[in-house]
């Protein structure tokens, strides 16, 4: 995170974000007006998604701006046709809006099932990794010292900035759960302390999904190499 990158110069979102409503509105406008153009294309690219992701999650989770506000701002622009040559923006923002719907879904899921913070959604997977957790592996993962460059870079960046793109978050969890056999509750508690945009409903559902203990989602193992 300390190394300057030519692709990150003059970016409007920034690696480490400031808080507050004024900053939140600034980030919202820059995303709707410009940065969303490559939202889908760069979703899995850690180098570029720093800027093309919405970067609104910290403001949403801290109540600085609301989902309704984001949707309304998007609708205003869509109705006025933004400007010429904005089809890409509309398509990408529509995809982002669908993720806002999923955000609400997961928050409601935790409210309906508050025990998903502590228990696997499918009881057959409860405690499946309890006897395998290697403390050395766990500490190496927490410190970003596993020896796998992309994993370590993501963890160190998260420690430094409090934020990661979605796919990189998923990879960190997948690596901990499948490669190191760390119980998702242990890794989940640690990650929760690092995210500046920590949202319990999203966090614990994703921890379980990326660890393969829901019983309904496909097993996703990210290649760290």
Predicted regions and their residues:
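Glycine/tryptophan-enriched, flexible segments
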Residues: 1-123
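Short acidic (Asp/Glu) and glycine-rich catalytic loops that position anionic groups and cofactors
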Residues: 7, 49-51, 71, 129-135, ...
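A glycine-rich phosphate-binding loop feature that marks nucleotide/adenosyl-phosphate handling sites
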Residues: 44-51, 122-128, 173, 208-213
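Secondary-structure capping and boundary motifs in well-ordered enzyme cores
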Residues: 48, 52, 58-62, 66, ...
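Contiguous, well-ordered alpha-helical segments that form the cores/surfaces of helical PPI scaffolds
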Residues: 57, 136-140, 149-159, 169-179, ...
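Hydrophobic alpha-helix feature that most strongly marks membrane-spanning transmembrane helices
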Residues: 75, 105, 111, 156-159, ...
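Active-site core of glycosidic bond-cleaving carbohydrate-active enzymes
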Residues: 99-101, 107-150, 156, 166-170
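C-terminal, helix-dominated tail/subdomain
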Residues: 125, 129-132, 190-225
């Amino acid at each position: 995170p300390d190394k300057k990158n030519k692709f990150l110069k003059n970016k409007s979102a920034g690696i480490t974000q400031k808080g507050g409503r004024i900053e939140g509105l600034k980030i919202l406008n820059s995303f709707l007006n410009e940065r969303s153009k490559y939202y889908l294309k760069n979703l899995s690219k850690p180098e570029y998604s720093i800027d093309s992701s919405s970067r609104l999650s910290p403001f949403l989770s801290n109540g600085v701006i609301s989902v309704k506000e984001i949707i309304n701002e998007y609708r205003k622009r869509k109705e006025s046709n933004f400007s010429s040559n904005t089809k890409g923006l509309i398509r990408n923002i529509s995809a982002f809006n669908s993720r806002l719907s999923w955000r609400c879904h997961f928050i409601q899921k935790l409210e309906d099932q508050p025990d998903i913070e502590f228990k696997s959604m499918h009881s057959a997977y409860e405690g499946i990794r309890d006897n395998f957790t290697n403390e050395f592996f766990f500490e190496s993962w927490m410190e970003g010292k596993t020896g796998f460059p992309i994993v370590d870079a993501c963890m160190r960046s998260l420690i430094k900035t409090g934020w990661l793109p979605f796919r990189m978050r998923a990879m960190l969890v997948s690596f901990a759960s499948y490669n190191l056999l760390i119980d998702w509750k242990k890794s989940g508690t640690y990650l929760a302390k690092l995210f500046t945009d920590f949202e319990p409903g999203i966090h614990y559902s994703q921890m379980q999904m990326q660890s393969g203990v829901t019983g309904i989602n496909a097993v996703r193992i990210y290649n760290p190499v």
